[in-house]
Amino acid sequence: MKKWSSTDLGAAADPLQKDTCPDPLDGDPNSRPPPAKPQLSTAKSRTRLFGKGDSEEAFPVDCPHEEGELDSCPTITVSPVITIQRPGDGPTGARLLSQDSVAASTEKTLRLYDRRSIFEAVAQNNCQDLESLLLFLQKSKKHLTDNEFKDPETGKTCLLKAMLNLHDGQNTTIPLLLEIARQTDSLKELVNASYTDSYYKGQTALHIAIERRNMALVTLLVENGADVQAAAHGDFFKKTKGRPGFYFGELPLSLAACTNQLGIVKFLLQNSWQTADISARDSVGNTVLHALVEVADNTADNTKFVTSMYNEILMLGAKLHPTLKLEELTNKKGMTPLALAAGTGKIGVLAYILQREIQEPECRHLSRKFTEWAYGPVHSSLYDLSCIDTCEKNSVLEVIAYSSSETPNRHDMLLVEPLNRLLQDKWDRFVKRIFYFNFLVYCLYMIIFTMAAYYRPVDGLPPFKMEKTGDYFRVTGEILSVLGGVYFFFRGIQYFLQRRPSMKTLFVDSYSEMLFFLQSLFMLATVVLYFSHLKEYVASMVFSLALGWTNMLYYTRGFQQMGIYAVMIEKMILRDLCRFMFVYIVFLFGFSTAVVTLIEDGKNDSLPSESTSHRWRGPACRPPDSSYNSLYSTCLELFKFTIGMGDLEFTENYDFKAVFIILLLAYVILTYILLLNMLIALMGETVNKIAQESKNIWKLQRAITILDTEKSFLKCMRKAFRSGKLLQVGYTPDGKDDYRWCFRVDEVNWTTWNTNVGIINEDPGNCEGVKRTLSFSLRSSRVSGRHWKNFALVPLLREASARDRQSAQPEEVYLRQFSGSLKPEDAEVFKSPAASGEK
């Protein structure tokens, strides 16, 4: 074998690679030559070429595999294989170069990568398998974000795969992948690549890092250009009833907030690479505050973290963007976070927002509650009425009162201050007078309607002529009755158009409105039948009359005891009586069909029984001619058994007397004995169960009445009857006077009253004391929301009390050592400054 020098070999290498062994990664992939036998080693440091005559069992020294085991991705060795053909030699006369000369030659080792091999490497946290990935991508002019390296179903990239396979919170392939993407000019595309399937669409590596609670990876991704505004809007991230998923507001900032990661929240808002927009909205218009309200579930732990995170984000927003009113931003439904909390029944979050009081001077303008004075457990507070009162669209009162019956804690939310006192103030000032007046008018209307119906003409067909003086009064009463029916009809139409209640809400919350609407329908039907010359107008009229007197219960809302009693009646009708009637009708119809099948008219007319002949003896008495061979008559007869007035021998026209008696006895046992007594027991249990609930429901019904009355006013009248006063509570971040419409509430709190000792005036409850010290114009009053003029709140009092707390020296209090006696001097209390350490 002729040996060539390394210089000669190097000179011959390039033309050989170009002409005889082209690079398999260049050119059309379909025209590539088949690869050589794959190497069995994944090591890159040493590669051996086995020439003719070498043993097939020879493996590289560092090969970890056994014979017959193949890598999923082979290593292709492309080397300048030089053959020498002597003149006269045949095809078998070719000679391979010696191994020494081959080892000295220039070799080029490349490993082919596909999606499967890369995914396996990153899932196993194996950086060694990715050492040749950069060379492969550069040679093939490909990128990690190409479709061939993505999951065809989900669009998952190798970076997303690595983020999902962390080992002890780390995956060393992630920095390697980012560096490879940087050198292939695809870093931004790889970092921001997201899922493409409909289920996880939009989720990026940053979302996964936040969900995995990994601050280091979040920092790494943001440093490398991760989009902090990327929205994950797949089906899994939408709030769909009955489907698994987690709604967090789509954005990375919202995800960090909803998973209680304050550190990541602060990093996203304050990092030096790309800061998140705190006012950004998702596809439904929700901000990060809306998202926090959505994830609240009214449990103690959840409410604690949600309110804490809500407060931190609100204060961060005030510090980063002083003029931004983050809490006033609305979603696509026009709801603020406060209104959303009310509409979804998040009572813990609602109470926190309504009663939020912040002490920090730079964030004090975020407070909605301002304590004016405190004396022991009693303190007077001013509540901001913005977004609460009905003067604004989507106010909290309207959202709670007009929300669906399926809204949790709907009745309890009205007990949260200041909502409870605000509704009571509206009722006391003007609503109750209007309500009582309407009650008197309705009573007068029903009396007129009753008189017109009672003195209706009996002879002839309608319409009737007016011949006497009394007829004019009767017609006047009829006209007034019809006008009342028309009014109730259009009021019902307006109610249904505005509220659009569901079927369940219609029978639960719209109970009275539906009865008034039915009353109006019967009245209008009466008018149509009357002028159609049909005497059947009387049937429709009496139904309207009966419903009219029944609807008198609506006005029991103005009286607490009667209102609670009416609520109990309504609940028993809708819960217990409806279920009883369903089962009873089934029994009644079933046994009636069985009994009527046994009855045959005229079966025993010729042979009257002894009891029958004795019952009807006498010349003037004859057996009744009524027939029970009809379902209607049999149902009426069986109904008598239900109320204990039935007769087992109400007829003799039947076959199989034993079967007949057994059917009647079974019916009596199931209805009169079982169902009726069960109904009584259920009603008693319902009364005990919903005693407190009925009071809350009555308050809700009265709240609806208050709001309906207020909405019936003109806009100018609404402002005149508005509760509260316009007050200056401090200063806005830009230095302007902060005026708010506030409502005053005096409260007693025995839990935290000892923490308010610094918030005290010389004359608590006497506004003149504040006037003397701060030159504010006040009026002495303790009545909530009434009889007090505009005055500036006392933030200076808080600052003064804070200075007092800072200047006060803490003292240690201890007793004299017990000496065994019970003399008064043994109870002497000693005080000393804590700093001195003397005892």
UniProtKB/Swiss-Prot annotation:
Residues 456-472, 533-535, 599-630, 653-656 are extracellular. It comes from Homo sapiens (Human). Resiniferatoxin binds at residues 511-512, 550, 557. Keywords: ANK repeat, ATP-binding, Calcium, Calcium channel, Calcium transport, Calmodulin-binding, Cell membrane, Cell projection, Glycoprotein, Ion channel, Ion transport, Membrane, Metal-binding, Nucleotide-binding, Phosphoprotein, Postsynaptic cell membrane, Repeat, Sodium, Synapse, Transmembrane, Transmembrane helix, Transport. Ca(2+) binds at residue 647. Residues 1-58 are annotated as: Disordered. Phosphorylation by PKA reverses capsaicin-induced dephosphorylation at multiple sites, probably including Ser-117 as a major phosphorylation site. Phosphorylation by CAMKII seems to regulate binding to vanilloids. Phosphorylated and modulated by PRKCE, PRKCM and probably PRKCZ. Dephosphorylation by calcineurin seems to lead to receptor desensitization and phosphorylation by CAMKII recovers activity. GO terms for cellular component: dendritic spine membrane; GABA-ergic synapse; membrane; plasma membrane; postsynaptic membrane. Changing residue 511 to A: Loss of sensitivity to capsaicin. Impairs response to inhibitor SB-366791. This is Transient receptor potential cation channel subfamily V member 1. GO terms for biological process: behavioral response to pain; calcium ion import across plasma membrane; calcium ion transmembrane transport; cell surface receptor signaling pathway; cellular response to acidic pH; cellular response to alkaloid; cellular response to ATP; cellular response to heat. Non-selective calcium permeant cation channel involved in detection of noxious chemical and thermal stimuli. Seems to mediate proton influx and may be involved in intracellular acidosis in nociceptive neurons. Involved in mediation of inflammatory pain and hyperalgesia. Sensitized by a phosphatidylinositol second messenger system activated by receptor tyrosine kinases, which involves PKC isozymes and PCL. Activated by vanilloids, like capsaicin, and temperatures higher than 42 degrees Celsius.
